[in-house]
Protein backbone atom coordinates (compact mmCIF):
# COMPACT_ATOMS: atom_id res chain seq x y z
CA UNK A 1 0.00 0.00 0.00
CA UNK A 2 1.28 3.45 -0.81
CA UNK A 3 2.29 5.73 2.06
CA UNK A 4 -0.59 8.09 1.38
CA UNK A 5 -3.10 5.38 2.21
CA UNK A 6 -5.23 4.89 5.30
CA UNK A 7 -3.01 2.34 7.04
CA UNK A 8 0.22 4.25 6.44
CA UNK A 9 -1.25 7.56 7.65
CA UNK A 10 -2.63 5.83 10.72
CA UNK A 11 0.70 4.17 11.54
CA UNK A 12 2.65 7.40 11.01
CA UNK A 13 0.30 9.34 13.30
CA UNK A 14 0.48 6.62 15.95
CA UNK A 15 4.29 6.56 15.77
CA UNK A 16 4.50 10.34 16.12
CA UNK A 17 2.29 10.30 19.20
CA UNK A 18 4.28 7.47 20.75
CA UNK A 19 7.37 9.68 20.37
CA UNK A 20 5.49 12.54 22.07
CA UNK A 21 4.52 10.18 24.89
CA UNK A 22 8.13 9.10 25.40
CA UNK A 23 9.30 12.73 25.45
CA UNK A 24 6.60 13.66 27.98
CA UNK A 25 7.48 10.73 30.25
CA UNK A 26 11.15 11.71 29.96
CA UNK A 27 10.32 15.26 31.07
CA UNK A 28 8.33 14.01 34.06
CA UNK A 29 11.04 11.48 34.96
CA UNK A 30 13.88 14.00 34.73
CA UNK A 31 11.97 16.49 36.89
CA UNK A 32 11.27 13.85 39.54
CA UNK A 33 14.89 12.63 39.38
CA UNK A 34 16.24 16.17 39.77
CA UNK A 35 13.98 16.78 42.75
CA UNK A 36 14.86 13.43 44.32
CA UNK A 37 18.60 14.05 44.10
CA UNK A 38 18.23 17.62 45.29
CA UNK A 39 19.59 19.07 42.06
CA UNK A 40 16.73 21.56 41.88
CA UNK A 41 14.96 22.72 45.02
CA UNK A 42 12.51 25.18 43.47
CA UNK A 43 9.05 23.63 43.47
CA UNK A 44 7.99 26.11 40.77
CA UNK A 45 10.62 24.83 38.32
CA UNK A 46 9.84 21.19 39.08
CA UNK A 47 6.10 21.85 38.86
CA UNK A 48 6.49 23.69 35.57
CA UNK A 49 8.48 20.88 33.94
CA UNK A 50 6.04 18.24 35.19
CA UNK A 51 3.06 20.32 34.00
CA UNK A 52 4.57 20.57 30.50
CA UNK A 53 5.21 16.81 30.53
CA UNK A 54 1.65 16.00 31.63
CA UNK A 55 0.16 18.40 29.04
CA UNK A 56 2.22 16.81 26.26
CA UNK A 57 1.26 13.34 27.50
CA UNK A 58 -2.46 14.20 27.38
CA UNK A 59 -2.13 15.56 23.83
CA UNK A 60 -0.22 12.44 22.76
CA UNK A 61 -2.79 10.10 24.33
CA UNK A 62 -5.64 11.99 22.65
CA UNK A 63 -3.85 11.81 19.30
CA UNK A 64 -3.06 8.11 19.73
CA UNK A 65 -6.63 7.19 20.70
CA UNK A 66 -7.99 9.32 17.86
CA UNK A 67 -5.66 7.64 15.37
CA UNK A 68 -6.35 4.08 16.54
CA UNK A 69 -10.14 4.55 16.54
CA UNK A 70 -10.30 7.06 13.66
CA UNK A 71 -12.25 9.27 16.08
CA UNK A 72 -13.32 12.42 14.23
CA UNK A 73 -13.90 14.63 17.30
CA UNK A 74 -10.64 13.69 19.04
CA UNK A 75 -8.66 14.21 15.85
CA UNK A 76 -10.28 17.62 15.33
CA UNK A 77 -9.41 18.89 18.81
CA UNK A 78 -5.98 17.27 18.52
CA UNK A 79 -5.31 19.32 15.37
CA UNK A 80 -6.51 22.55 17.00
CA UNK A 81 -4.48 22.13 20.20
CA UNK A 82 -1.36 20.95 18.38
CA UNK A 83 -1.64 23.90 16.00
CA UNK A 84 -1.82 26.34 18.93
CA UNK A 85 1.14 24.62 20.60
CA UNK A 86 3.09 24.96 17.34
CA UNK A 87 2.46 28.72 17.16
CA UNK A 88 3.44 29.24 20.80
CA UNK A 89 6.53 27.02 20.59
CA UNK A 90 7.68 28.51 17.28
CA UNK A 91 7.51 32.05 18.69
CA UNK A 92 9.36 31.04 21.87
CA UNK A 93 12.04 29.17 19.89
CA UNK A 94 12.66 32.13 17.59
CA UNK A 95 12.87 34.40 20.65
CA UNK A 96 15.46 32.10 22.23
CA UNK A 97 17.61 32.27 19.10
CA UNK A 98 17.19 36.03 18.67
CA UNK A 99 17.86 37.27 22.21
CA UNK A 100 21.27 38.98 22.57
CA UNK A 101 23.67 39.01 25.52
CA UNK A 102 22.47 42.41 26.72
CA UNK A 103 18.89 41.17 26.97
CA UNK A 104 20.10 37.96 28.62
CA UNK A 105 21.94 40.03 31.25
CA UNK A 106 18.77 42.04 31.93
CA UNK A 107 16.70 38.86 32.35
CA UNK A 108 19.33 37.25 34.60
CA UNK A 109 19.58 40.39 36.71
CA UNK A 110 15.80 40.64 37.10
CA UNK A 111 15.50 36.93 37.95
CA UNK A 112 18.35 37.05 40.48
CA UNK A 113 16.64 39.60 42.72
CA UNK A 114 13.31 37.77 42.84
CA UNK A 115 14.96 34.50 43.90
CA UNK A 116 14.97 33.46 47.53
CA UNK A 117 18.24 33.64 49.47
CA UNK A 118 18.30 29.84 49.59
CA UNK A 119 18.06 29.53 45.81
CA UNK A 120 20.80 32.14 45.26
CA UNK A 121 23.03 30.33 47.75
CA UNK A 122 22.49 27.01 45.95
CA UNK A 123 23.34 28.57 42.59
CA UNK A 124 26.51 30.15 43.98
CA UNK A 125 27.66 26.81 45.37
CA UNK A 126 26.69 24.90 42.21
CA UNK A 127 28.48 27.30 39.85
CA UNK A 128 31.28 28.09 42.36
CA UNK A 129 30.83 31.86 42.06
CA UNK A 130 29.80 34.81 44.20
CA UNK A 131 27.35 37.63 43.52
CA UNK A 132 25.84 38.50 40.18
CA UNK A 133 27.28 41.56 38.46
CA UNK A 134 29.49 44.06 40.26
CA UNK A 135 27.20 46.88 39.21
CA UNK A 136 24.92 47.25 42.22
CA UNK A 137 25.32 48.24 45.84
CA UNK A 138 23.97 44.83 46.86
CA UNK A 139 26.85 42.96 45.19
CA UNK A 140 29.12 43.34 48.22
CA UNK A 141 26.37 42.07 50.49
CA UNK A 142 25.93 39.02 48.24
CA UNK A 143 29.67 38.46 48.23
CA UNK A 144 29.94 38.68 52.03
CA UNK A 145 27.28 35.99 52.54
CA UNK A 146 28.55 33.78 49.69
CA UNK A 147 29.41 30.17 50.70
CA UNK A 148 31.00 29.01 47.43
CA UNK A 149 34.24 27.00 47.62
CA UNK A 150 36.14 29.52 45.50
CA UNK A 151 35.88 32.09 48.29
CA UNK A 152 38.13 30.04 50.55
CA UNK A 153 40.57 29.11 47.77
CA UNK A 154 41.30 32.50 46.22
CA UNK A 155 41.09 36.20 47.16
CA UNK A 156 38.29 36.82 44.67
CA UNK A 157 35.57 34.70 43.10
CA UNK A 158 34.27 34.94 39.58
CA UNK A 159 30.92 36.71 39.35
CA UNK A 160 27.96 34.41 38.80
CA UNK A 161 26.60 36.71 36.12
CA UNK A 162 29.55 35.95 33.85
CA UNK A 163 29.05 32.21 34.22
CA UNK A 164 25.30 32.48 33.82
CA UNK A 165 25.72 34.43 30.58
CA UNK A 166 28.05 31.78 29.18
CA UNK A 167 25.71 28.92 29.99
CA UNK A 168 22.53 30.80 29.09
CA UNK A 169 23.86 31.67 25.64
CA UNK A 170 24.59 27.99 24.93
CA UNK A 171 21.32 26.85 26.51
CA UNK A 172 19.22 29.32 24.52
CA UNK A 173 20.75 28.15 21.24
CA UNK A 174 20.09 24.51 22.13
CA UNK A 175 16.56 25.25 23.34
CA UNK A 176 15.81 27.32 20.26
CA UNK A 177 17.10 24.63 17.91
CA UNK A 178 15.30 21.78 19.67
CA UNK A 179 12.14 23.88 19.91
CA UNK A 180 12.18 24.61 16.18
CA UNK A 181 12.69 20.91 15.43
CA UNK A 182 9.69 19.92 17.56
CA UNK A 183 7.68 22.78 16.06
CA UNK A 184 8.02 21.22 12.63
CA UNK A 185 7.11 17.77 14.00
CA UNK A 186 3.94 19.38 15.37
CA UNK A 187 3.12 20.78 11.93
CA UNK A 188 3.68 17.26 10.61
CA UNK A 189 1.28 15.98 13.28
CA UNK A 190 -1.39 18.51 12.29
CA UNK A 191 -1.01 17.61 8.61
CA UNK A 192 -1.14 13.86 9.31
CA UNK A 193 -4.19 14.24 11.56
CA UNK A 194 -5.99 16.38 8.96
CA UNK A 195 -5.16 13.95 6.18
CA UNK A 196 -6.05 10.87 8.22
CA UNK A 197 -9.30 12.43 9.47
CA UNK A 198 -10.49 12.95 5.89
CA UNK A 199 -9.61 9.42 4.77
CA UNK A 200 -12.30 6.76 4.68
CA UNK A 201 -11.72 3.66 6.77
CA UNK A 202 -11.68 0.74 4.28
CA UNK A 203 -13.14 -1.53 6.97
CA UNK A 204 -16.11 0.77 7.61
CA UNK A 205 -19.55 0.58 6.06
CA UNK A 206 -19.18 1.84 2.45
CA UNK A 207 -22.39 3.86 2.76
CA UNK A 208 -21.23 5.63 5.96
CA UNK A 209 -19.89 9.19 5.80
CA UNK A 210 -16.11 9.06 6.29
Curated annotation (Swiss-Prot):
State which ranges are Extracellular (membrane side): 34-44, 94-173
Kindly list the GO CC terms recorded for this protein.
membrane
Q: Where, by residue number, does the polypeptide cross the bilayer? A: 13-33, 45-65, 73-93, 174-194
| Record's bilayer topology term | Multi-pass membrane protein
Give the keywords, sorted: Glycoprotein, Membrane, Transmembrane, Transmembrane helix
Task: Tell me which positions the record assigns to the signal sequence.
Answer: none
**Main location class:** membrane
Chain ranges sitting on the Cytoplasmic side read 1-12, 66-72, 195-210
Please name the Pfam families in this protein's record.
Answer: Tetraspanin
What are the annotated glycosylation sites? 100, 109, 117, 134
Which family does this protein fall into?
Belongs to the tetraspanin (TM4SF) family.
Q: Which PANTHER family match?
A: TETRASPANIN (PTHR19282), TETRASPANIN-31 (PTHR19282:SF3)
**What is the protein name for this chain?**
Tetraspanin-31
* Protein's organism: Pongo abelii
Amino acid sequence: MVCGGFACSKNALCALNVVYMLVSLLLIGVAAWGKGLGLVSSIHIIGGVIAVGVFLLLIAVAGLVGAVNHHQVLLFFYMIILGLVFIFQFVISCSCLAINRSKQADVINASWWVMSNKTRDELERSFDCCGLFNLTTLYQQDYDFCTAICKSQSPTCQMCGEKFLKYSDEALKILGGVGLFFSFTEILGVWLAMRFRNLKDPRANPSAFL
